[in-house]
C-alpha cells in the first residue's frame, strides 16, 4: 500500500498562501479542469503547490519550461517531500542532432546523439514510481510530450520474481536478455547482470545505488535480497521483486515480427507511388534503407532509427497520438504547469518544427510516411490527455485566463511582507550616465544591479563602458552554456561583481535576493522584449529585496509600460494595506547561495549502514567544469571507484561513490 505525502517545512502558510491553498483545493475537489494561480515573484508559489499536493494526496506532474527551472523545482520538492518519490524527467540527450535532408545542397545529415546515462536512469525511475505508487511528484520539462514506450507493452515485459517461485536459471537469463540487460561478470553496472553458480546479481536500470541478488536452489527461487553493488553488503531480504526493462522502448518479439510485416506492406505501397511519379532515385534509396532496417530488426530486435517505426511497434493507427509520460500518469493525477506563459506556447510549437523536417525526409525517400507519426504530441492531444491542471505564473497568458474562465486565484501578498519594487520612469537621453550613478550607490551598500538591453551589441557596448568607468560588471548572453550561466548568477550573489547585463535571460525563475535595482533600457520600444508580460517579469527580479526598485528608461509611456506599472502599483498597494492591517514589518530573504548546484543533496542516499552517514564529499574543484568535461570526470571517477572495489579497498571506493553522486547532481542542474 502506497504511503501518503508528508510535507517537511519549518514554515507555515502565510500571507496570501492559506487562501490560495484553500481555493485551489476547493476547485480541484469540485472537479474544475483548469485553475490559474497568479503568484507574484517571491510569494512562495512552490510552497503553495506543495501544500496542495500534500493535502490532496494525488500523483502529480510539474511541467517546467527548461532544464534549469526543472532542476530548481526538483531540488525544492525533494526538500519538501524527502520521504516520498520525487522524480526528474527531462531529455536524456547531452547532444542531439536529428537526421535531416537539405535539398538545396543535396546534403543528408545522419542522426547523432549522446545519451546521459544518469538522466536516463532518473527517467526510468520516474515511470517506475508512477506505475508502482501514488505518493509521486514528477518534475518534467517539455520532454514529457515526446514519444515514450507504450505502458501496456512496458508492463507486459516486466520480470516478476517471488520467493519460492519455480523457474530455472536459463529462463531468468533469457528474460533478462529480452529486457535488454546485458551479462557482464567483470564490471557490474546499471542495466547488467552477472552469474556465479546459482546466484544471479541484477543491477536494475532505474537504480543507481542498490542491486538485487537472486539465489536459486534446484530451479526454485530460494532468496531475494537487496545489496550494495559497490561493497557487496546485504541490506535486507524481500519477498518479491519486479525487474523493469532497461529502456522504455523495449518491445516483445512477436510485436516486432508483426511490425515488420506491416512495414513491408507500407514499403511496397510507397514504392509504387514513387515509381508512378518517376522518382527512381528516391525509390531505390527508400528500398535500400528500409530493407537494411528490417534485417537488423529481425536479427537484433532493434535498428538505428527504430523510433521512425514507432507507429507499428506500438500498434497505433495513422495519425494517432504517441504514447508519452502522460499515459503513465493515473487518471486522477494532477498537472502543475509552472511559468505557464512560457511553457504552454512551447508545447504548441514542438509538433510543427518536427513535422516540417520529417516531411522533407519522406518526400526524398529517406523515410516511409509512417515516420511522420514518430512525433511529439499536438496541442489538441495535450489538452485531451491533461488531467486537472493548475497554471502557475506571475503573468498568465491569454490561454490560461480563457481556460480558467477569468477566475484567477491571486497570491500577491508575500509571507515575508516584502513589497513589489518601486517604479520610476526616466528619460532615455541620459540613461547610461544615470545608470552608472545608480550602480555606484548600490555597490557602496553591497547590493546588486540587473540591467536589460534590447540588443546583443548594445549589451556588449554597455558592459565595456561600465567596466571602463570602474563598475564590476559581467555580461550574460545566449552563447553562454547553462553551467557558466549558473556560475555567473552565483558569483553575482556572492559579490564577485555588482552588475549583470543581459537581454532576455534575466526573467523567469531567477532567485536573487541581493538584487535591489533592475534597470530596463529603452523601455518605450514596443515589442516582445518590452511587452507587458516581459516588463512585469523583469521588474519582478527586484522583488526579493527590501529596497527593490525598477527604473524604466523611456521618453514616453507605452501601453505595455502603463499596464505593467499599473499592475505593479496595484499589487504594491494591496501588499502595503495587508502589512499595515496586521502590523507586519517586511523582512529580506536569506536564500542559500548555490541552491541549484546543490540539487537534491539534503536527501543524500537512503538508509542502511554507511549510506547517510558519509561526510559531504568536496567537489568544489569541479564546479567550473563544462557539462562535457564534468561528464568525462564522472566516468573517470567511476572507473577508479570500480577498481578500488575490485581490490577490496572499500573505504576509498565509498568516498569516490559519494563524490560521483554529488557530481551527478551538479551535472543535472547544469545540463
Curated annotation (Swiss-Prot):
Molecular function per GO: ATP binding; ATP hydrolysis activity; DNA binding; excinuclease ABC activity; helicase activity
Entry keyword Hydrolase: yes
InterPro entries, alphabetized: Helicase/UvrB_N, Helicase_ATP-bd, Helicase_C-like, P-loop_NTPase, UVR_dom, UVR_dom_sf, UvrB, UvrB_inter
Entries under Gene3D superfamilies matching the protein: P-loop containing nucleotide triphosphate hydrolases, UVR domain
GO CC term (a single one): cytoplasm
Signal peptide (from-to): none
GO aspect biological process, one term: SOS response
Ranges where the Helicase C-terminal domain occurs: 431-593
Start and end residues of each Helicase ATP-binding domain: 26-183
UVR domain: residues covered: 631-666
Motif (Beta-hairpin): 92-115
Keywords carried by this UniProt record: ATP-binding, Cytoplasm, DNA damage, DNA excision, DNA repair, Excision nuclease, Helicase, Hydrolase, Nucleotide-binding, SOS response
Location(s) in or outside the cell: Cytoplasm
Regions crossing the membrane: none
Residues that, per the record, bind ATP: 39-46
Alphabetized SUPFAM superfamilies for the sequence: C-terminal UvrC-binding domain of UvrB, P-loop containing nucleoside triphosphate hydrolases
Family: Belongs to the UvrB family.
Function per UniProt: The UvrABC repair system catalyzes the recognition and processing of DNA lesions. A damage recognition complex composed of 2 UvrA and 2 UvrB subunits scans DNA for abnormalities. Upon binding of the UvrA(2)B(2) complex to a putative damaged site, the DNA wraps around one UvrB monomer. DNA wrap is dependent on ATP binding by UvrB and probably causes local melting of the DNA helix, facilitating insertion of UvrB beta-hairpin between the DNA strands. Then UvrB probes one DNA strand for the presence of a lesion.
Record's comment describing the protein's domains: The beta-hairpin motif is involved in DNA binding.
PANTHER family: UVRABC SYSTEM PROTEIN B
Quaternary structure, from the entry: Forms a heterotetramer with UvrA during the search for lesions. Interacts with UvrC in an incision complex.
Protein name: UvrABC system protein B
Organism: Yersinia pestis bv. Antiqua (strain Antiqua)
Gene: uvrB
Amino acid at each position: 500500500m502506497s504511503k501518503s505525502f508528508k510535507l517537511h517545512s519549518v514554515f507555515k502558510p502565510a500571507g496570501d498562501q492559506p487562501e490560495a491553498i484553500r481555493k485551489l483545493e476547493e476547485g480541484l475537489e469540485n472537479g474544475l479542469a483548469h485553475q490559474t494561480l497568479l503568484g507574484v515573484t517571491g510569494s512562495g508559489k512552490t510552497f503553495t503547490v506543495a501544500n496542495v499536493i500534500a493535502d490532496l494526496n494525488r500523483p502529480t506532474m510539474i511541467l517546467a519550461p527548461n532544464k534549469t527551472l526543472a532542476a530548481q523545482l526538483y531540488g525544492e520538492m525533494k526538500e519538501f517531500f524527502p520521504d516520498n518519490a520525487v522524480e526528474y524527467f527531462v531529455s536524456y540527450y547531452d547532444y542531439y542532432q536529428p537526421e535531416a535532408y537539405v535539398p538545396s545542397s543535396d546534403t543528408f545529415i545522419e542522426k547523432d546523439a549522446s545519451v546521459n546515462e544518469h538522466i536516463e536512469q532518473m527517467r526510468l525511475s520516474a515511470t517506475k514510481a508512477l506505475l508502482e505508487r501514488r505518493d509521486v511528484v514528477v518534475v518534467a520539462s517539455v520532454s514529457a510530450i515526446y514519444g515514450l514506450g507504450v505502458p501496456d507493452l512496458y508492463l507486459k515485459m516486466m520480470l516478476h520474481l517471488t520467493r519460492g517461485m519455480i523457474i530455472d536459471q536459463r529462463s531468468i537469463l533469457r528474460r533478462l536478455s529480452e529486457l535488454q540487460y546485458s551479462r557482464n561478470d567483470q564490471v557490474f553496472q546499471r542495466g547488467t547482470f552477472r552469474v556465479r553458480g546459482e546466484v544471479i546479481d541484477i543491477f536494475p536500470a532505474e537504480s543507481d545505488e542498490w542491486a538485487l541478488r537472486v539465489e536459486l536452489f534446484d530451479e526454485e527461487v530460494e532468496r531475494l535480497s537487496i545489496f550494495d553493488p559497490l561493497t557487496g553488503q546485504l541490506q535486507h531480504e524481500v519477498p518479491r521483486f519486479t525487474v523493469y526493462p532497461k529502456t522504455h522502448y523495449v518491445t516483445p518479439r512477436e510485436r516486432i515480427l508483426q511490425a515488420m510485416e506491416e512495414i513491408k506492406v507500407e514499403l511496397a505501397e510507397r514504392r509504387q507511388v514513387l515509381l508512378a511519379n518517376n522518382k527512381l532515385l528516391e525509390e531505390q534509396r527508400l528500398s535500400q534503407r528500409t530493407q537494411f532496417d528490417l534485417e537488423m530488426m529481425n536479427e537484433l530486435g532493434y535498428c538505428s532509427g527504430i523510433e521512425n517505426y514507432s507507429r507499428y511497434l506500438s500498434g497505433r493507427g495513422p495519425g494517432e497520438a504517441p504514447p508519452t509520460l502522460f499515459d503513465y500518469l493515473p487518471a486522477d493525477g494532477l498537472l502543475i504547469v509552472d511559468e505557464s506563459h512560457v511553457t504552454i506556447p512551447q508545447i504548441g510549437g514542438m509538433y510543427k518544427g518536427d513535422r516540417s523536417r520529417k516531411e522533407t525526409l519522406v518526400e526524398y525517400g529517406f523515410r516511409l510516411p509512417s515516420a511522420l507519426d514518430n512525433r511529439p504530441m499536438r496541442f489538441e492531444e495535450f489538452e485531451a490527455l491533461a488531467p486537472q491542471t493548475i497554471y502557475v505564473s506571475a503573468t498568465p497568458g491569454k490561454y490560461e485566463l480563457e481556460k480558467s474562465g477569468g477566475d484567477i486565484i491571486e497570491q500577491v501578498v508575500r509571507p515575508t511582507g516584502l513589497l513589489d519594487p518601486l517604479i520610476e520612469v526616466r528619460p532615455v537621453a541620459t540613461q547610461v550616465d544615470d545608470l552608472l550613478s545608480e550602480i555606484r550607490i548600490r555597490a557602496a551598500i553591497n547590493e546588486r544591479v540587473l540591467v536589460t538591453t534590447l540588443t546583443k551589441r548594445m549589451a556588449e557596448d554597455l558592459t565595456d563602458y561600465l567596466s571602463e568607468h570602474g563598475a564590476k560588471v559581467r555580461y550574460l548572453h545566449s552563447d553562454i552554456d547553462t553551467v557558466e550561466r549558473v556560475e555567473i548568477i552565483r558569483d553575482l550573489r556572492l559579490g564577485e561583481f555588482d552588475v549583470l547585463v543581459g537581454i532576455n535571460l534575466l526573467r523567469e525563475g531567477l532567485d536573487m535576493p541581493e538584487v535591489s535595482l533592475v534597470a530596463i533600457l529603452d523601455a518605450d520600444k514596443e515589442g516582445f522584449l518590452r511587452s507587458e508580460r516581459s516588463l512585469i517579469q523583469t521588474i519582478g527580479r527586484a522583488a526579493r529585496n527590501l529596497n527593490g526598485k525598477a527604473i524604466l528608461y523611456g521618453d514616453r509611456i507605452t501601453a505595455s509600460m502603463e499596464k505593467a506599472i499599473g499592475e505593479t502599483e496595484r499589487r504594491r498597494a494591496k501588499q502595503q494595506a495587508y502589512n499595515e492591517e496586521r502590523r507586519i514589518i517586511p523582512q529580506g530573504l536569506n536564500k542559500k547561495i548555490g541552491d541549484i548546484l546543490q540539487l537534491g543533496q539534503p536527501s543524500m542516499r537512503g538508509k542502511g549502514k554507511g549510506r547517510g552517514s558519509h561526510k559531504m564529499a568536496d567537489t568544489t574543484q569541479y564546479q567550473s567544469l563544462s557539462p562535457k568535461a564534468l561528464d568525462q570526470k564522472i566516468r573517470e571517477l567511476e572507473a577508479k571507484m570500480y577498481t578500488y572495489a575490485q581490490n577490496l579497498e572499500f573505504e576509498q571506493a565509498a568516498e569516490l561513490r559519494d563524490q560521483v553522486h554529488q557530481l551527478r547532481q551538479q551535472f543535472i542542474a547544469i545540463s
